[in-house]
């Protein structure tokens, strides 16, 4: 039985967007173990994904931290991966290909280019179009890449809703990734006040923070 590695860091939205591709990869390697290399924030969430046989933590420490990179290399080498599917396609994962994972067959944006095609042109396409082309180039049968099914991630929160709402509510996601704080809209507190005024508190306003956003969420 061979081992297959998928690399996906990014944000939660990026991982959700890649979920269909992960399913297609698993379906194409049914007799192999498929593992995901990802960030700490998504270990618990992706550990429940039925298309994965395991999740490996990448602390994503600076590349000058040779002790960490050496430990990560030793860990990855233990799995003896036959294929790597780089769905992140970042400078970091290019570095991993060059120095940490030289032996496996590698699938990335760069390996998916047609003769004469420039990477800059390839990157102008939508994320899912790029992933689909990448997987097709690696002979993956495409069925779910653009038909993402997240039923496995649904949780029963009826008890929470009964505690904080009367059945109807307004849910707000006011946060963004730490790397791109410039994308965060600064007027959510004012918006919440306006919503309460407009609906005269008819609908409770709920916020869905991440683990590091709870204190800030309470201030809203």
Predicted regions and their residues:
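Catalytic machinery of carbohydrate-active enzymes
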Residues: 1-220
């Amino acid at each position: 039985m061979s081992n297959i590695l998928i690399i996906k860091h990014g944000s939660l939205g990026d991982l959700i967007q890649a979920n269909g591709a992960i399913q297609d990869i698993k379906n194409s390697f049914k007799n192999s173990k498929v593992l995901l290399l990802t960030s700490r924030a998504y270990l618990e969430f992706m550990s429940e994904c039925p298309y994965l046989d395991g999740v490996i933590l990448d602390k994503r420490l600076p590349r000058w931290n040779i002790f960490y990179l050496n430990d990560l290399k030793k860990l990855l080498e233990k799995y003896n991966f036959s294929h790597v599917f780089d769905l992140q396609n970042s400078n970091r994962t290019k570095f991993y290909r060059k120095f940490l994972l030289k032996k496996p067959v590698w699938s990335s944006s760069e390996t998916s280019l047609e003769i004469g095609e420039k990477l800059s042109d390839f990157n102008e396409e939508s994320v899912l179009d790029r992933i689909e082309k990448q997987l097709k180039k690696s002979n993956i049968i495409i069925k779910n890449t653009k038909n993402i099914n997240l039923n496995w991630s649904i949780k029963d929160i009826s008890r929470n809703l009964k505690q904080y709402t009367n059945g109807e509510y307004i849910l707000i996601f006011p946060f963004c990734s730490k790397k791109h704080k410039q994308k965060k809209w600064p007027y959510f507190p004012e918006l919440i006040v306006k919503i309460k005024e407009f609906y005269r508190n008819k609908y409770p306003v709920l916020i869905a923070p991440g683990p590091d956003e709870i204190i800030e969420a309470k201030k809203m």
